[in-house]
């Protein structure tokens, strides 16, 4: 996928997955893209995350209902347009990939949404080049 294709896809609201070997500049390109667009970049280094880093920590609210305390990155992307960068997606455990899929597809956690102009870019290494990596769930890979 060319840089122009990534640019067009991201601007059109489609999530983008950059799949390439380590060290080719996927992360650097994403930060430069965010800078060019004048958008803050919120990064989740998924290889070091657990599910609560993606969805937030559970708690019991004032109505005795289970809820989630949303992570800072999510609250930041609710307030203003920004770019969510899911780095090292192929090194994320399946338990982290699952909540990441919902965030990518719905730009939401529970019933709260991110800013409607939020862009999502993910970076992954091919399975044969991802040290300690996992196969991507088909919905994420597509």
Residue ranges with predicted function:
Residues 1-142:
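AAA+ P-loop NTPase catalytic core and its hallmark functional loops
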